[in-house]
A protein has these predicted regions:
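N-terminal lobe/hinge region of extracytoplasmic solute-binding protein
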Residues: 1-82, 110-113, 182
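Ligand/substrate-recognition segments at binding pockets and active sites
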Residues: 11, 194, 247, 356-381, ...
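Detector for C-terminal structural segments
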Residues: 31-33, 47, 54, 193-198, ...
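Gly/Pro-rich hinge or "lid" segments in bacterial periplasmic/extracellular proteins
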Residues: 55-68, 113, 157-222, 229-233, ...
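Aromatic-rich, solvent-exposed beta-strand/loop patch
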Residues: 72-76, 98, 103, 144-163, ...
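Surface-exposed binding/hinge segments that line
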Residues: 90, 124-168, 184-193, 338-353
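Ligand-site clamp/hinge motif
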Residues: 92, 175, 208-258, 300, ...
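Extracellular/periplasmic solute-recognition and catalytic clefts
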Residues: 132-134, 190-201, 226-290, 297-301, ...
Length: 570
């Protein structure tokens, strides 16, 4: 994005792989929930989240050791215009799908147009910025853009290339499990049972084994995703060896329950892994499309009523630090105190529309650690009163006597979230609010969140050191009401849109950082999400035969790292 890539044109392999890793073995992970689709490229159905990374080979691949650098995979070469107004890719000779047929420019152009018109919403925004797509040679294609946006040349390199002939006569947007996608990537779906498991096998004839970006990766023969009804069942399966790799998010369980026989005798290894990526945002999001949460003062009251310090002690022994903003734990996070310098310049035109704290400084409410949280409760009552709500006969009501109530929607398998909400409900009772808690199965949960049919729900948004066009999907106004989008809170803010636009057109690293810091301020002071704790390290328990390189990239345990750079060795 800025400057030069870290690796030279003749690099041999990525710095965080073992180019001499052996091949073989299997990795089995536990997934909570279910699935009813194998097509990760459309909105319909519930798909194992990993499939879009396994099945979507693209022109370029992202290095996990650099925020904004891509290297060739399907692309033999890439060229851009002087102002990145166009980008041209040349397809590698010999690139092939898993059925042995060659990848062609016809496949490329069909994939881009199909994904951009009837694919998942994550693909639609890019396509609207493509002015033209033209074949410029037997193995080359050029994309010309209709807006100034430095990231578009990178995004163009990261779209999955699918086999056009497989989808002839098929409604691409409506497919679920009846078609198993043919891919040019290293793995292909070998077997599956809806709602139970998906097995992916390493393609022994994979065309790209000698491509530098792929060398030393995709070493494990079978990647198997096993599905369970809840976290307890998944953990029990790991304990008895049905699963051989487990990513643990519950620090209390990590410290108290990872002492079973397989760990004691050395058959299972515990790995604690650092990373340098932002915290992202995890917590409970409020839907501003609903009347209950359209007033920022009500959202602020909900934040004050959430007794984080008490909950964190109960859930993690206070060992997990709180998320303080969307890009906290990174150089892109908002600074303490008033907005200054370039950040203030960017926000000043929108000062009248920004919420308190955006310009002058803001930090999340902090409790005293006690269960009653008296100061937080008092502030919550004060903000509710400012918004027109008071306690009448022990219940929070408006001037017309209507009670303030809302629904909290949770996913069936998320026992940790249910425990947090149980404590939150007790805190809300102290301000006369009694929410309804609804636990839905995975399919219902996805359908309702896709349609924005919720008041408050669990929210997790991983963010990187290279934010770009995806921020429009997360927080932009234009598609805020498009079903299946990612703007769950329903943000429609000219300041947010402008900051995203600025980070996309920044021509220097300093300007880019200022734009992200400004965006972080607007989002955090918008009080859309009640943040919980962050995972500033990764905790993985795995069979001793599963190994990874000593050098951990900047992004750490992130899509593209496990199982990609791991190997199995007895």
């Amino acid at each position: 994005m800025y400057g030069d890539p870290a690796l030279p044109p003749d690099f041999v392999s990525l710095p965080y792989v073992n180019p001499d890793a052996p091949t073989g073995g299997r990795i089995v992970t536990a997934e909570v929930g279910s699935f009813d689709s194998l097509n990760p490229f459309v909105r319909k159905g519930s798909t194992p989240w990993q499939l879009r990374f396994f099945l979507g080979e693209s022109f370029m691949g992202r290095s996990l050791d650099e925020p904004f650098s891509l290297y060739g995979v399907l692309a033999e070469s890439v060229e851009t215009g002087p102002d990145r107004e166009w980008v041209e890719f040349t397809l590698r000779e010999g690139a092939a799908f898993s059925d042995g047929s060659p990848v062609t420019i016809e496949d490329v152009m069909w994939s881009y147009e199909t994904l951009g018109t009837v694919g998942h919403p994550r693909y639609l925004g890019f396509w609207t910025k493509v002015d033209s797509m033209e074949q410029t040679g037997e193995r080359s294609v050029r994309f010309t853009f209709n807006v100034e946006d430095r990231e578009l040349a990178l995004l163009a390199g990261m779209r999955p290339i699918l086999k056009k002939a497989q989808w002839d006569g098929v409604d691409f947007a409506e497919t679920t499990t009846e078609i198993v996608p043919i891919t040019s990537a290293p793995y292909m779906i070998d077997d599956f049972e809806p709602g139970r498991f998906v097995s992916l096998r390493r393609n022994p004839d994979y065309w790209g084994n000698d491509v530098p970006f792929r060398r030393g990766t995709n070493n494990i023969d079978e990647v198997r995703l096993e599905f369970f009804g809840d976290e307890t069942a998944a953990f029990e399966a790991f304990k008895v060896g049905e699963v051989n790799s487990n990513r643990e998010f519950n620090v209390a369980r990590w410290e108290s329950q990872y002492n079973f026989p397989a760990i004691q005798n050395g058959d299972v290894v515990l790995s604690v892994l650092p990373h340098q990526r932002p915290s992202g945002m995890t917590g409970f999001v409020m839907n501003t499309r609903r009347d209950q949460f359209s007033d920022w003062r009500v959202r602020d009251a909900m934040l004050h009523a959430f007794n984080f310090e008490f909950i964190n002690e109960a859930m993690t022994g206070s060992q997990q630090p709180r998320i303080t903003s969307y890009w906290s734990n990174s150089p892109l996070g908002m600074s303490d105190g008033p907005a200054e310098g370039r950040v203030r310049e960017l926000l000043s035109p929108f000062a009248e529309s920004l919420l308190p704290g955006a310009m002058d400084g803001y930090s999340l409410p902090m409790g005293d650690g006690t269960e009653r949280n008296r100061a937080g409760t008092a502030m919550a009552l004060e903000q509710m009163e400012a918004a027109g709500w008071t306690i009448q006969d022990g219940q929070m009501k408006n001037a017309s006597g209507d009670p303030f109530t809302f629904e909290i929607l949770l996913d069936q398998g998320a026992s940790e979230n249910q425990a947090i909400i149980d404590m939150y409900v007790e805190s809300l009772a102290r301000i006369g609010v009694t929410p309804t808690v609804t636990v839905a199965d995975s399919a219902q949960f996805k359908e309702r969140t896709d349609q924005y049919d919720f008041d408050m729900t669990y929210y997790r948004r991983g963010l990187s050191l290279s934010p770009g066009n995806e921020q429009y999907n997360y927080y932009g106004s234009e598609d805020a009401d498009t079903p299946g989008g990612r703007n769950l809170m329903g943000i429609k803010s000219s300041a947010v849109d402008a900051m995203i636009g600025r980070l996309l057109t920044s021509e220097s690293q300093d300007d880019f950082v200022a734009a992200v810091k400004a965006l972080d301020r607007v989002l955090t002071t918008g009080r859309y999400v009640i943040p919980i704790y962050q995972w500033n390290i990764s905790r993985l328990a795995h069979a001793k035969e599963l190994k990874y390189p000593e050098y951990i990239p900047v992004f750490g345990d992130w899509p593209g790292w496990q199982p990609d750079v791991w190997w199995y060795e007895e």
